[in-house]
UniProtKB/Swiss-Prot annotation:
Keywords: Endoplasmic reticulum, Glycoprotein, Glycosyltransferase, Membrane, Transferase, Transmembrane, Transmembrane helix. GO terms for biological process: protein maturation. One of its GO terms (cellular component) is endoplasmic reticulum membrane. Pfam families: TMEM260-like. This is Protein O-mannosyl-transferase TMEM260.
Length: 703
C-alpha cells in the first residue's frame, strides 16, 4: 500500500506484522479496560439498562428484537462474577466489550497502514469520546455492537490481505458467522453487513473462487451465527421469568418480536414524528465534530483522497468503509422518527451514531498514517514519525482530559436512589401500575434483581394492553386479581376469545390492596373516574375511592417528607435519564400543593373549605419556593398565583402588601426564566395590574 508509519512495511514479514498487531491490540485493550473499569457506575444506569439486566437475571426476553446474545452473556456474567451488585456486573461486562472494540479498531488500522500511532488514534479518540465512553460503561447493547463493528472491519481487512484461496475461504466463513452473530445483538449493524457481503462475494468471484459449495458453507455459517435466537422461544415456552416481553412460542409471535413490529420495524419508536432527514444528518455531523473533533473528520476525508492514488486493493477497503458510513447515516436519518429538538430524544438518537463514529475513527487513523507517509516522502524527514506519535498522543489525551469528569460515573447512583425512594414510599402489599421507561425499568430491576420490597406487585400499564402480557405474567403476580385477559376501555370478548376489562373493574377486584400509578395513568381509559380519584403520592399518585373525604392536613403530613432527595436542581444534562429522574423528584414536592390548589379552584367547594385549601396551598408553595435557591421555574408561577388568590380572600391574617410584593416578584422571575410560555404576555399584563394595585395600596397606607 505504500504506508508504513512506524510499524514497517507489510511486506517486511507476516510474523512481525501479525505479532505487532496482536501486541498492540492487547495493550489497547488493557488500557481502555482499565479506564472503563475505573469509571463505570456501581449501581443501575438509566435508559434500557434496568430492563436488559432484569431480562438477563430472570432469563426472560428483552424488548424487541430480544437481544438474545447480550441476554445470555449478561446472565452468564451475573452468575459467574460473585462481587458487586447485579447492575455492576453487567456494567463491567459492557466496559470489557468496549475495550475489545477499541482493540479491534487498532487492529484494523494497523493492518491497513502499519502505523501503531494511527491505530492508537482511532481506538483512543473513539473510545474516549463522551458518547462512546458513556454508553460503554452502562449495561446497554451499544458496546457489544461496537465490538461487532470493529470485528467485521478487522475481518474485512484480513480477507483483503489473504493471499491463498483457502485462507480467504476460512476468513469468509468466520465473517459470515460473525455477521449472523452480530444480528443477535443490535439490528442496525445489518446496514454494514449489506455492504460487506456483496463486496466479499465480488472479491471471491473476481478470484474465481465463488463456488456453489462455498456459497452453501457461508450460508450455513451465517445461519449458525443466528442460533442464539433459539433462546427466545425456549425462554417463552418455559415461562419461568418474572419479567419478559412477548410470546415467541409461535412463529408469528417470534417474527413480531424479531422484526420489532410493536415499535415499527425500521423505526426507533412507535407513533412518533421525527425531524427531517437533513436536520438529522446535519445534527450527526455537528455531533461528530463535538465528539471526535474537526481534525478527526478532516483526517477521515484525507484518507479517502490520498488513498485513491495508492494501492487499489487496499483503497477498495477504505471505500467500502466509507460506503458503509454513508449508507448507514442516510438510512438512519430517514428512519430516526424522533424529534431531536427535544433533549431526551436527542440523547436516544445520538447513541446510534456510535456505529458511524467507529468508521470515522478508523478512517482518521488511516488519514494520519497517510499524511505522515506523504510528508515523509516529500520532505525525507525521519522526525515526522515522532510527530505522528505526538499527534496521536495529544488527540487521545485531550479526549480523556475533556471527558473524564463527565464520564466518571463511580458515584452516580441517581437512578438507583430514584427507584429506591419510590419503592420505600409504598405501603405494605401495594399494587404499582407502572408507566414509562424510567420508573418501569428501574423499579423492576430493584424488585426482581436486588430483591427490594418483595411484598409489592409491579404491573405495567402499557403491557396490559398487549395480548401476550397477562397470559405470561399473571402467574407471577399472585396477589393481583385480573378480571380478564387484556386491558381495554371497552369490555367484551375478542374474536380470539380473550376477555377484556377496564381499569375500573380492575380496581374493584383489587380493593383489598392500595393501588398507585407511577408515573401517570393511561389516558385511553377514563372508566376509573366513575368511583375513584387520584391523590398525589410524591412522583406517583394513589387511586382512592371517591367516597373517601380528602383531609388536607393529614395528606400534607403523609406526603411532606415522602422522599429523601438531595440532588441539586439542574445538576445533570437535559438529555440524560438522571435529569429526568431529578426533575421528577423535584416536581414531586410541588404535587401536593398543586393538588390542593386545584381542589380550591373547584366551583363545588364551599367558601370556608375553599379558603382553607387556598391557605394550605399558599403555605406549602411558600415553603418549597424558599427551601432552595434553585428550583423548577414553574414554582414561581404557581406560588405567585397562590399569593394572588390569598389576596382576594377575606381574613387571611397576611398583610396584603406582602402578598402583592410576593406575587409581583415571582411572576417577574417566571417571565424572565420562562421565555417560551404561551401565557407570558398575559402574565406580563397581570404584572402591570398588580404593580398598580401595590402602588395604590402603599399610597393608602401613607395617607
Amino acid at each position: 500500500m505504500g504506508l508504513h508509519g512506524d510499524g514497517g512495511s507489510p511486506a517486511a514479514g507476516a510474523g512481525p506484522w501479525r505479532s505487532g498487531a496482536l501486541r498492540g491490540s492487547v495493550a489497547v485493550f488493557a488500557s481502555v479496560a482499565a479506564v472503563f473499569t475505573l469509571t463505570l457506575p456501581r449501581s443501575l444506569p438509566g435508559g434500557d439498562s434496568g430492563e436488559l439486566i432484569t431480562a438477563a437475571h430472570e432469563l426472560g426476553v428483552a424488548h424487541p428484537p430480544g437481544y438474545p446474545l447480550f441476554t445470555l452473556l449478561a446472565s452468564l456474567t451475573i452468575t459467574l462474577f460473585p462481587f458487586g451488585s447485579v447492575a455492576y456486573r453487567v456494567n463491567l461486562l459492557c466496559g470489557l466489550f468496549g475495550a475489545v472494540a477499541a482493540s479491534l479498531l487498532f487492529y484494523t488500522v494497523f493492518r491497513l497502514s502499519g502505523s501503531h500511532a494511527g491505530g492508537i488514534l482511532a481506538a483512543g479518540v473513539f473510545s474516549f469520546s463522551r458518547l462512546t465512553w458513556q454508553w460503554s460503561i452502562a449495561a446497554e447493547v451499544f458496546s457489544l455492537n461496537n465490538l461487532f463493528v470493529g470485528l467485521l472491519m478487522a475481518l474485512t481487512v484480513r480477507f483483503e490481505e489473504a493471499t491463498a484461496a483457502k485462507e480467504r475461504s476460512k476468513i469468509a466463513a468466520i465473517g459470515a458467522f460473525s455477521c449472523g452473530l452480530s444480528l443477535c445483538n443490535q439490528h442496525t449493524i445489518v446496514l454494514y453487513i449489506l455492504c460487506i457481503i456483496p463486496w466479499i462475494l465480488f472479491r471471491l468471484l473476481k478470484e474465481k473462487e465463488l463456488t456453489l459449495s462455498l456459497l452453501l458453507r457461508l450460508t450455513l455459517a451465517f445461519s449458525a451465527g443466528l442460533l442464539p435466537y433459539v433462546y427466545l422461544p425456549v425462554s417463552s415456552y418455559l415461562s419461568r421469568a418474572r419479567w419478559t416481553w412477548g410470546d415467541q412460542t409461535t412463529l408469528r409471535g417470534f417474527l413480531t418480536h424479531f422484526f420489532r413490529e410493536e415499535y415499527g420495524t425500521f423505526s426507533l419508536a412507535k407513533s412518533e414524528v421525527g425531524s427531517s432527514v437533513s436536520t438529522v444528518l446535519l445534527s450527526q455531523v455537528i455531533n461528530m465534530k463535538t465528539e471526535l473533533s474537526f481534525n478527526i473528520q478532516a483526517l477521515a476525508v484525507w484518507a479517502n483522497i490520498c488513498l485513491a492514488r495508492k494501492d487499489r486493493r487496499k483503497s477498495s477497503v477504505v471505500w467500502l468503509f466509507t460506503g458503509m458510513l454513508c449508507l448507514y447515516s442516510l438510512f438512519f436519518a430517514w428512519r430516526a422518527n424522533l424529534d431531536i429538538s427535544k433533549p431526551l430524544f436527542m440523547g436516544v438518537v445520538e447513541r446510534f451514531w456510535l456505529q458511524s463514529n467507529a468508521v470515522v475513527a478508523v478512517l482518521a487513523g488511516l488519514g494520519l498514517a497517510t499524511l505522515v507517509s506523504e510528508t515523509n516522502r516529500v520532505l525525507h524527514c525521519t522526525g515526522i514519525r515522532n510527530l505522528e506519535w505526538l499527534s496521536a498522543a495529544l488527540f487521545v489525551a485531550y479526549q480523556v482530559y475533556s471527558n473524564y469528569s463527565i464520564c466518571d460515573q463511580r458515584t452516580n447512583n441517581v437512578i438507583d436512589q430514584f427507584a429506591r425512594n419510590l419503592l420505600d414510599s409504598m405501603p405494605q402489599d401495594a399494587i404499582i401500575l407502572l408507566r414509562g421507561d424510567l420508573p418501569g425499568n428501574a423499579l423492576r430491576y430493584l424488585h426482581y434483581c436486588e430483591g427490594l420490597r418483595p411484598d409489592v406487585s409491579l404491573v405495567d400499564q402499557e403491557m396490559m394492553t398487549y395480548e401476550w402480557y397477562l397470559p405470561k405474567m399473571a402467574r407471577h403476580l399472585p396477589g393481583v386479581h385480573f378480571p380478564g385477559d387484556r386491558w381495554n376501555p371497552v369490555e367484551g370478548v375478542l374474536p380470539s376469545g380473550m376477555v377484556t376489562f377496564n381499569l375500573y373493574h380492575f380496581l374493584e377486584m383489587n380493593k383489598q390492596k392500595e393501588t398507585f400509578v407511577c408515573i401517570g395513568i393511561h389516558e385511553g381509559d377514563p372508566t376509573w373516574k366513575k368511583d375513584y380519584s387520584l391523590w398525589p403520592w410524591g412522583s406517583c399518585d394513589k387511586l382512592v375511592p371517591s367516597k373517601i373525604v380528602f383531609n388536607p392536613e393529614e395528606w400534607i403530613e403523609r406526603t411532606r417528607a415522602i422522599y429523601n432527595w438531595t440532588e441539586a436542581y439542574e445538576r445533570f444534562g437535559p438529555s440524560s435519564w438522571e435529569s429526568v429522574a431529578n426533575e421528577e423528584m423535584w416536581q414531586a414536592r410541588m404535587k401536593t400543593p398543586f393538588f390542593i390548589f386545584s381542589l380550591a379552584e373547584s366551583a363545588a367547594v364551599p367558601a370556608d373549605v375553599k379558603a382553607q385549601l387556598y391557605t394550605h396551598a399558599y403555605k406549602l408553595y411558600k415553603e418549597i419556593v424558599y427551601l432552595q435557591e434553585e428550583h423548577p421555574v414553574n414554582w414561581h408561577k404557581n406560588y405567585a398565583i397562590a399569593c394572588e388568590r390569598m389576596l382576594r380572600l377575606p381574613g387571611t391574617g397576611i398583610d396584603p402588601e406582602v402578598l402583592l410584593s410576593e406575587a409581583i416578584r415571582h411572576f417577574h422571575l417566571y417571565t424572565q426564566k420562562a421565555q417560551n410560555d404561551p401565557q407570558r404576555a398575559d402574565i406580563i399584563a397581570a404584572l402591570k395590574h398588580l404593580r398598580r394595585e401595590l402602588q395604590s395600596l402603599r399610597n393608602i397606607k401613607k395617607v
